[in-house]
Each structure stands twice: as structure tokens, then as C-alpha cells.
């Protein structure tokens, strides 16, 4: 099993900053935005985008945490640990996740969101898009496009959980 770092902490910070600038440029009503971090690492990436929006635009963007397990079609869990303390009707929800792969997690996140309200719009921001979609889902904001083979894995590490920021590609062969 080979593991190779393909994004270091500096490059990750730049990618998150670029995503933040794209969110600012493409959204006319920044005050209607709600960031929805997909547990676990998507929440930490969403928090960093939230911090950058505060620094750049002096904007307090609400952040909610989504647990997709109860909404997945491949792994079932009865317990939904989502934290959605605000009304999302009429808002522009931007889902935030670490890696976009098949699209199944995003579909589950959308199901979770619409079970709690009716946003005006749902967008998607991901740190890494690795391809291999099984569903017709495309990210609106992408930090890095990293084409992979089906057998390879992408591992995102964040300081808050793993003690460091990096993205690794793991080749099991």
C-alpha cells in the first residue's frame, strides 16, 4: 500500500481561500447563505470557509452540521446527529464536504436538508473532486480536481481531527 501526500497544509489553505472567494463572487445575497458541513471533515472545512467569509466580508454566515448516515442507501443508521438550529426555508444552502466521489453522500445530504425545510437553492463545495460519479452530481466550488483510479483512495486529514492538514492518495497495489 503506497501513500503519497498530494496537498500540503499551505496548498489546502489556498484551496479553501479560493473556494471562499468563489462563493463571494457567485452569490449576490451573501446574507442568505447557510454553510452545511457534512460530518466529519466537511464540518471543519465549512468552519474554515465560515472564518474566511468573516475575515474577507465581515459576514457571520450560519453553519449547520449534517449527518448523512440515516439518509444513505448503502449504510443505514437510525440515529441522525445533525445540528440544524436555524430555519433553512428560503436560504441558499452550500453543502461542504472533503471529497466528492460517487455522489451518494451528497444525495443523502440533500435528502437530509429537504427533510428539515425548503431552501431556495442548494450548492456544493468540496475540497477534492476525484471523479467516478454514480449519480448526476457536480460541485459548484472545487478546491482541487484529483483524478484517481477506482482502486485508489483519497485521504483528507484536518488538524482538528488528525493533528495536521493534508490530502493523501493511497494506492492499495
Swiss-Prot record:
State which residue ranges cross the membrane: none
Q: Does the keyword Transferase apply?
A: yes
Output one GO BP term. DNA-templated transcription termination
Give the matching Gene3D superfamilies. Answer: 3.40.50.2020
Signal sequence segment:
none
* Keywords of this entry: Glycosyltransferase, RNA-binding, Transcription, Transcription regulation, Transcription termination, Transferase
Q: In terms of domain of life, where is this protein from?
A: Bacteria
Q: Where is this motif: PRPP-binding?
A: 93-105
Q: Which GO terms label this protein's molecular function in UniProt?
A: RNA binding; uracil phosphoribosyltransferase activity
- Please tell me whether the keyword Secreted is annotated for this protein: no
Protein name per its UniProtKB record = Bifunctional protein PyrR
Organism from which the protein derives: Streptococcus thermophilus (strain CNRZ 1066)
Q: Which gene name does the record give? A: pyrR
Amino acid at each position: 500500500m503506497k501513500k503519497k501526500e498530494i496537498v500540503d497544509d499551505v496548498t489546502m489553505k489556498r484551496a479553501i481561500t479560493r473556494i471562499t472567494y468563489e462563493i463571494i463572487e457567485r452569490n449576490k445575497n451573501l446574507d442568505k447563505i447557510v454553510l452545511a458541513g457534512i460530518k466529519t471533515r466537511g464540518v471543519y472545512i465549512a468552519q474554515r470557509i465560515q472564518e474566511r467569509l468573516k475575515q474577507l466580508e465581515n459576514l457571520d454566515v450560519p453553519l449547520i452540521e449534517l449527518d448523512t448516515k440515516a439518509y444513505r442507501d448503502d449504510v443505514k443508521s437510525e440515529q441522525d446527529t445533525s445540528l440544524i438550529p436555524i430555519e433553512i426555508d428560503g436560504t441558499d444552502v452550500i453543502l461542504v464536504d472533503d471529497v466528492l466521489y460517487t455522489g451518494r453522500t451528497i444525495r443523502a445530504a440533500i435528502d437530509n436538508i429537504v427533510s428539515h425545510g425548503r431552501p431556495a437553492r442548494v450548492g456544493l463545495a468540496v475540497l477534492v473532486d476525484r471523479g467516478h460519479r454514480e449519480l448526476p452530481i457536480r460541485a459548484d466550488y472545487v478546491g482541487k480536481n484529483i483524478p484517481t483510479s477506482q482502486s485508489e483512495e483519497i485521504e483528507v486529514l484536518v488538524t482538528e481531527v488528525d493533528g495536521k492538514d493534508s490530502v493523501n492518495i493511497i494506492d492499495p497495489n
